Amino acid sequence: MDKLRIRTTPGSEVKETAPGSWLLSLPSGKAGAYRWAQLDDYIHLARSAFLWRPPLRMEISARVSSGHVPGTWGFGLWNDPFNVSAGIGGTGRRLPAFPNCAWFFYASPDNYLALGDTHPAQGFLAATFSSPLIPPVFLAAGVPFLPLLAVKPAARIIRRFLRLLVKESAAQLSVDVTQWHTYQLEWRAGEVRFLVDGAVQFLTPVSPLGRLGLVLWIDNQFAAFPPDGRARFGSLDSPEPVWLELSAISVHE
């Protein structure tokens, strides 16, 4: 794909090792310093101009350096919901939004990115989020309530409220991610199918709404909003360098 843009933190690297093949790598380092390497096709676009909508099929071949990477990694489609951008330096103008995504997603044990109390939230997952397309400017009304996330009883109430707005679906995948596999995602209105090496692993009616962008990344970040309401986030210690290798990336409508 010729529309992919590279984004990294200092010391991390995205390198094209052959035409259409990429190596995303992070150095070792201590907790408290964010390390991140990413390819995407949306950084320069407003959310309303993101490239992808159903029906489509995404296909990627991938392997990762370890089955226990500290942080997160993955690939798929999302609306970049948490990014704020004023359109400076070639980026698209963007405000926060509720999440819409369909992706293969790995989360180390410090993470808990599920609103449902029974959904899998760690390990290698096939996952979707589907949220109403509320104009982002209206979400600004919730900003004064963000400090309440530090108060467990209030955070639990907020979590239950978000569960009413944000639909989600996820399944744990039993895959040796250190070996090459072909990952496929088929997104239709009202259905998403996840396949590994041509075999269906997960089928869900929870389909994201709106236009989405392609993202492929690895980082040492953790974020958790578990059932106990103790919201937390940060960056993890990385004793060893880690990498994500990708090839044959394609998205077809």
What are these model-derived regions, one by one?
Residues 57, 67, 210-253:
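Ligand-recognition surfaces built from glycine- and aromatic
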